[in-house]
Regions:
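Nucleotidyltransferase catalytic core that binds NTPs
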Residues: 1-177
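The conserved Walker
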Residues: 185
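Hydrophobic anchor at the beta1->P-loop junction of P-loop NTPases
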Residues: 181
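Hydrophobic positions on the alpha1 helix immediately C-terminal to the Walker A/P-loop
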Residues: 192, 196
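Conserved glycine(s) of the Walker
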Residues: 188
Length: 368
């Protein structure tokens, strides 16, 4: 039985890693992919790719591949640092060996390690050739250079859109540039979002609440806390689907998020025509906090109230006055600050063309 072994931090996994994995798989009967790293790694944690998350993504990626088995090694738990000392290698290799738990033992099994770094070749060969500290799971070491596919995790982290097609698909969502266009009603958010999406051919997320109300034939005065809970959950789900979709080439844009839902919920608590209470609002805000994790906005364009209110037959006209729209805008600003998004905000206070050109300019800067 021939066994291939690859290992790495995979932050993110990319085609360079897959070159190793696919070769190890094709040249052996089974292939082990060892995901390793530390707790509290700044480069990983800041983008949400903790060791456990990377391990989970890779397991999911290969769940239908009977040849590939995914292991995890937490270097922090092993008490080893990033140096390539003999003792560190001994501890690390023993952990890998124990996890393999090969029921057949090591008789008649050939273990080949596939690595993309020359230093790893030397270290593993030294362990194999040292009669005192040799490990039974090292027979051969194969170096797979990246001259034909020069890519690294560092290059991707520094410029993900440039190397988007090199990123393994499950990891792409963590490098997506997510843009939100927000504001009160009738300021041109939806039109601006669609126009930018059309111009660049990027996925966009629309206001779920509007679609929901049209489908069920509901007016604003029919809404209850249950409807608002549905808005919060499904809006997040729709945006996440766009971020994870194969159509995402690095940038996603949305014309609403849960801050807008909360803005309207606050306003409707004050409206005697709508059955929404302060306690209902507290429930909704807690739900919004709970589902905030996962979607990060890289840029938020905020449209202040200035345009003529357009009655499209679906809008709640009680909210149509400039005074009410200004109150709602102030609520939205307060929510953006409360939820920690204000540092991402840029106020768009130009005409329709000027606002389009500013967002277009921002998207183009991300594509350079």
């Amino acid at each position: 039985m021939k066994v291939g072994i690859t290992f790495g931090g995979y932050c993110p996994m990319h085609q360079g890693h897959l070159d190793l994995i696919m070769r190890a798989k094709k040249e052996n009967d089974i292939c082990y992919v060892v995901v390793c790293g530390y707790d509290n790694e700044p480069r990983a944690d800041e983008i949400g790719l903790t060791l456990n998350r990377r391990y989970s993504l890779i397991k999911q990626m290969f769940k239908n591949d009977e040849q590939i088995r995914v292991l995890k090694v937490n270097d922090t738990e092993l008490g080893i640092d990033e140096s390539m000392s003999e003792s560190n290698w001994d501890i690390w290799l023993e952990c890998v060996e124990n996890q393999m738990n090969l029921e057949w033992g090591y008789v008649d099994y050939i273990f080949t390690w596939y690595v993309g770094e020359p230093d790893y070749v030397s270290a593993l060969c030294n362990k194999r050739d040292n009669e005192i500290t040799a490990r039974p799971i090292i027979n051969n070491v194969t170096y797979v250079g990246r001259s034909k596919n020069p890519i690294s995790a560092t290059m991707i982290r520094e410029n993900p859109i440039k190397y988007w097609n090199k990123i393994a698909w499950p990891f792409r969502q963590y490098f997506s540039t997510n843009i939100l266009i927000t504001g009160t009603a009738s300021e041109g958010k939806s039109t601006l979002t669609r126009d930018i999406a059309t111009y660049f051919g990027i996925p966009y997320s629309e206001e779920y609440g509007r679609t929901y109300m049209e489908y069920y034939g509901k007016d604003d005065t029919d809404l209850t806390v249950t409807d608002f809970q549905q808005f919060l959950i499904e809006q997040r789900r729709d945006t996440q689907k766009k971020i994870e979709s194969p159509g995402n080439c690095g940038i996603v844009i949305s014309d609403t998020d849960n801050m807008v839902t909360l803005m309207y919920a606050q306003a409707y608590v004050e409206d005697p025509n709508i059955d929404l209470t302060e306690e209902d609002y507290k429930t909704l805000e807690q739900l919004a906090w709970n589902i905030k994790r996962g979607i990060q906005w890289d840029k938020i364009f905020l449209l202040p109230p200035k345009n003529k209110f357009v009655d499209d037959g679906c809008r709640y006209m009680v909210q149509s006055t400039m005074d009410e729209r200004t109150k709602n805008y102030n609520k939205l600003v307060a929510l953006l600050k409360k939820f920690g998004w204000w540092d991402k905000v840029e106020i768009l206070d130009n005409d329709f063309l000027g606002n389009f050109n500013r967002v277009k300019e921002y998207v183009e800067s991300k594509m350079e």
